[in-house]
């Protein structure tokens, strides 16, 4: 029979093992249920360009601009990013607010009680130097996913052009004299435009842990020919699909950096059209690397280099490789998109831009994109959109009518054709 001393030692060992096991179980359970820390991530963005005509050229004076943006992911707080990148003089924002829209009440109206001020270093106003940018303080506001948010800016002083802007917003902006940043009604904002001014991003704070995905593209990404005020760009459909289908709701933000007419090789200014923006390489730093939480870039440029610049396949491929190299150096995942069909596209009424010779360049580029090991993945928009009976043409039901830009249904088909596993981060890849 064991001595009392031996029994005490045995009991102490049993207790130690039991407590240790309990701690191990508790630690394991704690790891399993520990919430992802909140991080800032881009939910919406717009690529900005130098001024063109109208308001972008003339500027503003003692006026309010109310703009609407469509989120991809939601969050518990928000902040806005503003830019005076192409301005030649300081830009003063006298008052900025965020709110939920209330379109059933009237054009430009806001949901009562939803308007919140956006401060800058604790101040109501901010002055942004020429070529500069600003980020607001965090705004305590629940931001829903895949929903519109109203951003209202009041410009108190004479603000001459050129105004940094985005030409084809596909969203109505409302403009009026005086400070109406906190007004829930749009009644005094009677002037309308289809542009975004100075506003380049909306960030949210959330726990997705998936960061953001930037799409560097042209007019197809920009949503040209989609329904105005309906948010039917392929990136909008993709954002909504990810929110719905991503495991545990952990969707990345989708940031649209599309510019109509944009090219890999040349700027819009080379055509005398500033609002087409800088070429893809020149704007890569601002429009991709400058985004909040960016982890992946989708390259969706090249078709304008085929028909507008009439560049060679070798040059187009070299430019895509250059962009991929820039992304890799920044630690980003790189996905490319094949160039979609464009047979019968007219560059002007009665002027058919398409030729089989030019299309052979597109096909050569696509062959490279499908087979190259230079990228982390390929989205085959050519295969998704082409007419099986005539592969050089868009499917009729997805053609907006100009034979190069997909309609709303075509944009939805593009989003559905994307394998989501290309876009979602594995747990072991997260920071």
Predicted regions and their residues:
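Sec-exported extracytoplasmic/periplasmic mature domains
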Residues: 221, 239, 243-247, 289-293, ...
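Catalytic His-Asp segment of secreted/periplasmic serine-dependent ester chemistry enzymes
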Residues: 271-273, 340-429
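Structural motif
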Residues: 88, 194, 205, 289, ...
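Conserved SGNH/GDSL esterase-like catalytic core that processes O-acyl groups on lipids
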Residues: 44, 66-67, 90, 98-105, ...
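Proline-centered loop/turn at the N-terminus of a beta-strand
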Residues: 253, 333-335, 377
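Active-site-proximal beta-strand/loop segments in catalytic clefts of secreted hydrolases
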Residues: 83, 154, 216-219, 256-262, ...
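Active-site segments of SGNH/GDSL-like serine hydrolases
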Residues: 300-307, 324-362
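N-terminal secretory targeting modules
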Residues: 2-216, 221-230, 247-249, 426-427, ...
């Amino acid at each position: 029979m064991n001595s009392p001393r031996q029994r005490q030692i045995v009991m102490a060992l049993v207790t130690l093992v039991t407590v240790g096991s309990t701690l191990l179980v508790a630690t394991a359970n704690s790891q399993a249920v520990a919430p992802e820390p909140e991080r800032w991530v881009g939910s919406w963005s717009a690529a900005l360009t130098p001024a063109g005509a109208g308001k972008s050229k003339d500027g503003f004076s003692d006026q309010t601009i109310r703009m609407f943006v469509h989120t991809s992911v939601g969050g518990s707080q928000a902040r806005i990013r503003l830019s005076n990148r192409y301005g030649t003089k300081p830009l003063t924002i006298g008052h900025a607010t965020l709110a939920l829209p209330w379109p059933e009440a009237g054009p430009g109206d806001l949901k009562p009680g939803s308007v919140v001020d956006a401060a800058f270093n604790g101040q109501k106003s901010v002055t942004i130097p020429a070529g500069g940018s600003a980020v607001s303080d965090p705004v305590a506001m629940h931001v829903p996913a895949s929903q519109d948010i109203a951003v209202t800016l009041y410009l108190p002083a004479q603000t001459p052009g050129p105004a940094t802007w985005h030409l084809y917003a596909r969203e109505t902006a409302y403009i009026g004299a005086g400070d109406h940043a906190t007004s829930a009604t749009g009644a005094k904002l009677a002037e309308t435009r289809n542009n975004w001014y100075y506003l380049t991003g909306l960030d949210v704070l959330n726990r997705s842990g998936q960061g953001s995905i930037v799409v560097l593209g042209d007019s197809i990404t920009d949503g040209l020919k989609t329904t105005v005020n309906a948010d039917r760009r392929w990136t909008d459909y993709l954002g909504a699909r990810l929110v719905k289908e991503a495991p545990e709701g952990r969707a990345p933000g989708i940031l649209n950096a599309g510019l109509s007419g944009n090219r890999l090789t040349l700027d819009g200014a080379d055509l005398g059209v500033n609002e087409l923006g800088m070429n893809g390489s020149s704007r890569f730093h601002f429009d991709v690397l400058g985004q909040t939480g960016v982890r992946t870039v989708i390259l969706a440029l090249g078709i304008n280099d085929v028909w507008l610049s009439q560049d060679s396949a070798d040059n187009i491929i070299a430019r895509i490789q250059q962009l991929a190299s820039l992304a890799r150096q920044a630690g980003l995942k790189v996905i490319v998109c094949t160039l979609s069909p464009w047979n019968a596209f007219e560059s002007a009424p009665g002027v058919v831009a398409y030729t089989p010779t030019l299309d052979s360049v597109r096909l050569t580029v696509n062959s490279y994109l499908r087979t190259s090991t230079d990228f982390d993945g390929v989205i085959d928009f050519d295969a998704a959109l082409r007419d099986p009976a005539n592969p050089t043409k868009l499917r009729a039901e997805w053609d907006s009518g100009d034979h190069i830009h997909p309609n709303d249904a075509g944009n939805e088909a593009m989003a559905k054709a994307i394998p989501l596993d290309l876009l979602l981060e594995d747990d072991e890849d997260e920071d």
